[in-house]
Amino acid sequence: MKILVVSDTHGYTDKFDVVLEKEQPVDMLIHCGDVERDEDYIRAAAGCPVCMVAGNNDWGSDLQQEIVTEIGKYRVFITHGHRYYVPFEMDRLKAAAKERNAQIVIFGHSHMPYLQEEDGITFLNPGSISKPRQVSFEPTYAIMKLDDLSLIHISEPTR
């Protein structure tokens, strides 16, 4: 299973389209928020199941604040991250992941890619394809793959 993970697109559907075209086919899309009113467009363009949460800029959206779902054998916690004060601290997000028995946490908000395993939990932030903030200012996203052995392989966020 190939999963495209994006966050913080902030209404830049042209950049989303470029990434989607480059990575197709994908089996699932996860969007970690700050969609900014483009959720219908993203769902239609994806052509696959979509998990999408609201970010701090998604005012008035019907999107959920958080999703806990099963992907393969993994319990996955998806959130934007702003309610947990990322990137300034990870302790609250880690505690929330443990409360939800999550093995994988996927979040956004910081616009900076992050991939780390702590206490048996994998934390992934794909960064931003529209407004990156890391030192290189390169747009980033992530690809997650679940293989037949139900092992997860998360590639480094790429541009």
Regions found by a protein language model. Name each.
Residues 1-49, 58-60, 64-65, 137-140, ...:
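N-terminal active-site segment of His-dependent metallophosphoesterases
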Residues 11, 37, 83, 112, ...:
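Short active-site segment of divalent metal-dependent hydrolases/proteases
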Residues 149-159:
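Residue-level detector of conserved catalytic or cofactor/ligand-binding positions
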